[in-house]
From Swiss-Prot:
Xref: Pfam families: Y_phosphatase
InterPro entries linked to this entry: NR_tyrosine_phosphatase, Prot-tyrosine_phosphatase-like, PTP_cat, Ptpn1/Ptpn2, Tyr_Pase_AS, Tyr_Pase_cat, Tyr_Pase_dom
Alphabetized UniProt keyword annotations: Cell membrane, Cytoplasm, Endoplasmic reticulum, Hydrolase, Membrane, Nucleus, Phosphoprotein, Protein phosphatase, S-nitrosylation
Known function: Non-receptor type tyrosine-specific phosphatase that dephosphorylates receptor protein tyrosine kinases including INSR, EGFR, CSF1R, PDGFR. Also dephosphorylates non-receptor protein tyrosine kinases like JAK1, JAK2, JAK3, Src family kinases, STAT1, STAT3 and STAT6 either in the nucleus or the cytoplasm. Negatively regulates numerous signaling pathways and biological processes like hematopoiesis, inflammatory response, cell proliferation and differentiation, and glucose homeostasis. Plays a multifaceted and important role in the development of the immune system.
Region entry May mediate interaction with STX17, spans: 371-410
Annotated Gene3D superfamilies: Protein tyrosine phosphatase superfamily
Gene Ontology molecular function: DNA binding; integrin binding; non-membrane spanning protein tyrosine phosphatase activity; protein kinase binding; protein tyrosine phosphatase activity; receptor tyrosine kinase binding; STAT family protein binding; syntaxin binding
Oligomer and partners: Interacts with RMDN3. Interacts with TMED9. Interacts with STX17; dephosphorylates STX17. Interacts with ITGA1 (via cytoplasmic domain); activates the phosphatase activity towards EGFR. Interacts with TRAF2; probably involved in tumor necrosis factor-mediated signaling. Interacts with MET. Interacts with FAM220A and STAT3; interaction with FAM220A promotes interaction of PTPN2 with transcriptional activator STAT3, leading to dephosphorylation of STAT3 by PTPN2 and negative regulation of STAT3 transcriptional activator activity.
Entry protein name: Tyrosine-protein phosphatase non-receptor type 2
Organism expressing this protein natively: Rattus norvegicus (Rat)
Length: 416
């Protein structure tokens, strides 16, 4: 099975057909209604205007006045895998995010982006980074940090999610891949697979509990890559026929735009081919992935890491160690990436608009609070003024009565 995919990979590489294959997938993908995402009251719950959940597969918040969240349930029955793919939470949707995690009985959150990338906000800080808990009063949840395990390119947090109303608590694993660039790919299949199997070992992807929540910034590019590779490897482990293109098209029926670039598609093939070695019974492969990923090194500077990974995958710096492991060149054939670049520029504009909108919303909230305080003062001012006037009269009367008492009553008592 992996040999077939490897031959397909080599042919696509030799013929420089990654761009045409990506366009084929995009053109063959079905477009389903996504009306709820466009409702006026839901506009501020979407990070990007062009990334919306389909109506038939969107996750619905239960017991909420508005059940909308930009999240999709991707259900691959033959692999017994279910994922919730969602956008990076906004400041005003963090509370909805944790409500969804609770209601869906999720055991793990897989985060594939950083909160800020290339000076653009990609995701709100929805989990605590120190001992102070985060409280989300709107939906009645609090989150505490229990532990943190920092590796060179990913971090694992253990979080305690508490339902404030019932007092019930759950432990949530938070797997954070910290060096995967937007519209890009991980440094190598080995490092990615080491991370994927770390998530797998936690049992969080198993079907005996709620679906794992997978997110990046938009919830389609990096999230789609992660889900596609995991699904294909599960099917290979089950001995099923694996057609990567058809599986991706099937997954795109649940959430639009999964995998955003030809590079991400190519990397998915590389990771599937490399991951298939584990399904063949190579007991030492995971150990080699861990060694090649160099996860135990100290985390590097984010900016230099981001640049290194981009150069490496564009063929300017080739990882020789990884090539020895996979037998596949990490150099990508030159392709016309105009559509991807235009999407990236559009995404940057959307990020700026979203950041501006958030600042405007915060300013409006401050102005509204100031206006409420002013109205309260205007309401109470005449009452307090009258009360003050009455108090002055009462005090004056009391003082006058006291003086009158001293002048008239006390002399009589003295004479007596």
């Amino acid at each position: 099975m992996s040999a077939t995919i490897e031959r397909e990979f080599e042919e696509l590489d030799a013929q420089c057909r990654w761009q045409p294959l990506y366009l084929e997938i995009r053109n063959e993908s079905h477009d389903y209604p996504h009306r709820v995402a466009k409702f006026p009251e839901n506009r501020n719950r979407n990070r990007y205007r062009d990334v919306s959940p389909y109506d038939h597969s969107r996750v619905k918040l239960q017991s909420a006045e508005n059940d909308y969240i930009n999240a999709s349930l991707v259900d691959i029955e033959e692999a017994q895998r279910s994922y919730i793919l969602t956008q990076g939470p906004l400041p005003n949707t963090c509370c909805h995010f944790w409500l969804m995690v609770w209601q869906q009985k999720t055991r793990a959150v897989v985060m594939l982006n950083r909160t800020v990338e290339k000076e653009s906000v990609k995701c709100a800080q929805y989990w605590p980074t120190d001992d102070r808990e985060m409280v989300f009063k709107e939906t009645g949840f609090s989150v505490k940090l229990l532990s943190e395990d920092v590796k060179s390119y990913y971090t694992v947090h253990l979080l305690q999610l508490e339902n404030i109303n019932s007092g019930e608590t759950r432990t949530i694993s938070h797997f954070h891949y910290t060096t995967w660039p937007d519209f890009g790919v991980p440094e190598s299949p080995a490092s990615f697979l080491n991370f994927l199997f770390k998530v797998r070992e936690s049992g969080s992807l198993n079907p005996d509990h709620g679906p794992a929540v997978i997110h990046c910034s938009a919830g389609i590019g990096r999230s789609g890559t992660f889900s596609l590779v995991d699904t294909c490897l599960v099917l290979m482990e089950k001995g099923e026929d694996v057609n990567v293109k058809q599986i991706l098209l099937s997954m795109r029926k649940y959430r639009m735009g999964l995998i955003q670039t030809p590079d991400q598609l190519r990397f998915s093939y590389m990771a599937i081919i490399e991951g298939a070695k584990y399904t063949k019974g190579d007991s030492n492969i995971q150990k080699r992935w861990k060694e090649l990923s160099k996860e135990d090194l100290s985390p590097v500077c984010r900016h230099s890491q981001n640049r290194t990974m981009t150069e490496k995958y564009n063929g300017k710096r080739i990882g020789s160690e990884d090539e020895k492991l996979t037998g596949l060149s990490s150099k990508v054939p030159d392709t016309v990436e105009e559509s991807s670049e235009s999407i990236l520029r559009k995404r940057i504009r959307e990020d700026r608009k979203a950041t501006t909108a958030q600042k405007v919303q915060q300013m409006r909230q401050r102005l509204n609070e100031t206006e409420r305080k002013r109205k309260r003062w205007l309401y109470w001012q005449p009452i307090l003024t009258k009360m003050g006037f009455v108090s002055v009269i009462l005090v004056g009367a009391l003082v006058g009565w006291t003086l009158l008492f001293q002048l008239n009553v006390l002399p009589r008592l003295t004479d007596t």
